[in-house]
Amino acid sequence: MPIHRIGLIGDFDPEVVAHRAIPLAVELAASDCAFSISADWMPTEYLRTASEKVLQGFAGFWCVPGGPYRDMDGALRTIRFAREKRCPFLGTCGGFQHAAIE
């Protein structure tokens, strides 16, 4: 079974409850749907300069809660990539706000 990679756009902070819960939620959803999913944190500073080839390796993106992001442009760049490539995208809380800005 292929592994579907989901990029978690945001700056992981163990103090943010949602950041600790999101990987568990993805894991539970994957097991319910009989998929193999890898949820990979993508720090916004990294996303500012990440190659398009790196971004193409993901089946979808989740712009996660928790902000402000360290690099707003990195988050917006990745949201734009998802929109332009018609890649599945979810923005929650601050992630939704960034999607609206983009």
Q: Predicted regions: what is each one?
A:
Residues 1-102:
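N-terminal beta1-alpha1 cap of cysteine-dependent amidohydrolase-like domains
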